Amino acid sequence: SPLRLALRRIELLKLPIYPNAWPKNPAREVSSVLLNELFYVGITAMRNWTGEIEIGRGRIDFGHASRGKLDHVMEIEIGGSSRLDSDILKLCMIKREIPTVTLSLVAPSRAIKKRCHTGKCAEEVSVRLRELEPVLDNVRDIIVVEFDVPTKGISGYTNHLINGKNRFKNDKQLFTRGATKREIRKFIEKNRKSFFI
């Protein structure tokens, strides 16, 4: 299925860290902007997957088309939590318009949330979906996918990290703040082998 293929790709992403770049939040070491762009480069590299698709008056993060017909829609929830409800509503409306489409929503694990100072973790997204079930049709059709990497001490820990502070010392702004999405995307594409297992 399209989702299964996307999940395999997501499992190959390396978490781009830059330790001690946020003095006011020592637990944080990941830019949510960089992580979002990493998802974009990884998923859109797959066959039949497209990013930033305009549907009606809204835009979805990713869509998979088979024989020219949209059959899977994916939203990535890494960043502010304020857009979660609107993304859920968007997915439900797409399901109403295209009953055969499948839906997924990717959110970080609780551990990743702490590291990138993002809005909602996958567990919290699942709770919100249950809260909205009585008032929104098609909410039950949304598959929640948790994005996670091994923690310290677990096998594969270092393989799933890319330390920008060590590997790209002159590109701190790309790992922290001050760079545009286009600049970050171009940087990831140029250094693709460093960001994927």
Residue ranges and their predicted role:
Residues M46, G68, I98, D137-V139:
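Short, well-ordered coil/turn elements that cap or connect secondary structure elements
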Residues L34, R57, D71, R83-K90:
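Short, well-structured alpha-helical interface segments that form or flank functional binding sites
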Residues S1-A6, A122-I197:
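Non-catalytic C-terminal interaction segments of nucleic acid-processing enzymes
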Residues I60-V73, E97-I98:
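Active-site beta-strand-loop-beta-strand hairpin of nuclease catalytic cores
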Residues N25, H72-G80:
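Surface-exposed cleft-lining segments at the edges of enzyme active sites
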Residues S1-G58, A65-S66:
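Acidic-basic catalytic patches of nuclease active cores, encompassing PD-(D/E)XK
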Residues I78-L136:
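Catalytic cores of nucleic-acid endonucleases
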Residues G51, S104-V106, I143-E146:
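A structural signal for short, well-ordered beta-strand segments and their strand-loop junctions
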